[in-house]
A protein has these predicted regions:
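Conserved beta-strand segments that form the floor/walls of ligand-binding pockets within enzyme
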Residues: 21, 55, 134
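Nucleotide 5′-phosphate-binding alpha/beta core
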Residues: 1-45, 49-50, 193, 286-293, ...
Length: 329
């Protein structure tokens, strides 16, 4: 058996605080330092301040996101409601009864809360008290941001990072790119050769973090972007990442969770009736949806398939259907 965590861990297990599990599966260590993943500067830039009551809707189960984003909020003297992935009704009730001022989660879930709140007859600007939102884990449009800011009367800013390295970049008030975090050294490289590209050229984000516990040097994230070194009106001198324009590989990201092709193949391989399959990812109304299209002459095990999907793909929701005649699966 090989060494734990690929031999990249430099400390004894007793010096760690936690070890998490991310989709892949990938194991992510956390040492005992404060704000191990380095998100404090991003939350401050987004507008979170001492005295805010913040509802954190990222999962606290196995994956690191919940605690990853709670620690920096505590550094800023914010109180945190560890709501996790609780159902929409409870989330809205908590927001209203506790007069929550900050939201942390995916943009699609905030949109879902807005839609459900309006269905319940809530005036989101008057019945809720949200002032600031920090979102990550998904791409979203400026139209969606503007819509949510108007619905709730709040400021919404985004951050970018991974479970492996933590914070890589974040938006400031001017929202003209992602300031590269102080803890990160970022290169934009050719996806095939790993050779750094010139500023402004689109390539793969490759990051090195100054972490003495878990050595990750020139980690290729699989995301595509570019570097912008033009001065920012906010006064920060760090270069900025442009928009994330795509992925290098065929990995899909659904509601902040990665789904890898080999995970799907492991689930599908159990069902001999399925001849071909295809994953379809859409974002109607700003909310991620995934469909699993299957080709089978006769298939009556949809419930079993979806159950195995939920187990094999870490709870990422999907619906299964057969494609229309003539449509490739």
């Amino acid at each position: 058996m090989g060494p734990r965590l690929g031999g990249l861990l430099t400390k004894d297990l007793g010096e760690l605080r936690r070890v998490f599990l991310s989709p892949g599966p990938i194991f992510d260590p956390e040492d005992r330092s404060e704000d191990y993943w380095g998100w404090t500067e991003s939350f401050y830039a987004a507008g979170f301040r001492s005295g805010d009551l913040v509802q954190n809707t990222f999962s606290y189960h196995m994956a690191p996101a919940g605690l990853m984003f709670e620690e920096p909020l505590r550094q800023l003297n914010c109180a945190v409601v560890p709501a996790g992935t609780d159902n929409t009704e409870n989330q809205l009730d908590i927001m209203k009864k506790l007069r929550v001022t900050g939201y942390v989660g995916t943009p699609s879930f905030l949109m879902h809360l807005a839609q459900r709140g309006e269905e319940r007859g809530l005036n989101l600007r008057k019945d809720l008290y949200l002032e600031v939102a920090f979102v990550t884990g998904e791409k979203f449009s400026e139209k969606m941001r503007s819509n949510l800011e108007k619905k709730f009367d709040l400021l919404m800013r985004q951050g970018y990072g991974t479970a492996d390295v933590g914070c890589i970049g974040y938006e400031c008030f001017h929202k003209n790119g992602l300031h590269i975090a102080n803890r990160s050294y970022v290169e934009i490289c050719h996806p095939d050769t790993g050779i750094p590209l010139k500023d402004g050229e689109v390539g793969e984000i490759v990051v090195t973090v100054f972490n003495k516990t878990y050595l990750l040097i020139r980690l290729a994230t699989g995301d595509l972007s570019y570097i912008d070194r033009a001065p920012c009106p906010c006064g920060r001198t760090s270069p900025r990442l442009g928009n994330i324009v795509g992925r290098v590989d065929t990995t899909a990201r659904i509601k902040g969770m990665f789904v890898y092709p080999h995970q799907v193949e492991q689930v599908i391989s159990v069902f001999e009736e399925i001849k071909r399959w295809q994953i379809e990812v859409t974002n109607p109304g700003g909310i991620d949806e995934m469909r699993l299209l299957i080709e089978a002459s006769s298939f009556k095990r949809e419930e079993e398939l979806l159950h195995m999907w939920s187990s094999g793909c870490r709870g990422v929701p999907a619906s299964a259907c057969r494609p229309a005649p003539g449509r490739p699966a």
